[in-house]
Amino acid sequence: MAKATKPADLRAKTAEELEALLIDLKREQFNLRFQRATGQNEGQARVRTVRREIARVKTIASQALKKNAVGAGAPAAKS
């Protein structure tokens, strides 16, 4: 992932797509941590960007979950 993903783009994704993106980001974060530990990492900025991307994806997923829970748990309108 070369560029930071915009929140609007993330909101358009399904829960499965967000989960897949989160897995990819966590895998990249692991690889960057491993590179840093072995002294191969030259770009520290990418570590920070990936960490923020993970937080962004988790936030959007949490908001979507809460939005769906509130909508499903609302009582039906009385006639």
From Swiss-Prot:
What organism does this protein naturally occur in? Gluconacetobacter diazotrophicus (strain ATCC 49037 / DSM 5601 / CCUG 37298 / CIP 103539 / LMG 7603 / PAl5)
UniProt record, GO biological process: translation
Keywords associated with the record: Ribonucleoprotein, Ribosomal protein
Instruction: State the similarity comment.
Output: Belongs to the universal ribosomal protein uL29 family.
Extract the CDD domains matched here: Ribosomal_L29_HIP
Q: Which residues cross the membrane?
A: none
Organism ancestry:
Bacteria, Pseudomonadati, Pseudomonadota, Alphaproteobacteria, Acetobacterales
Q: Tell me the protein's name.
A: Large ribosomal subunit protein uL29
User: Under the cellular component aspect of Gene Ontology, which terms does the record hold?
Assistant: cytosolic large ribosomal subunit
Which Pfam families does the UniProt entry name for this protein?
A: Ribosomal_L29
Query: Which molecular function GO terms apply here?
Result: structural constituent of ribosome
Superkingdom classification of source: Bacteria
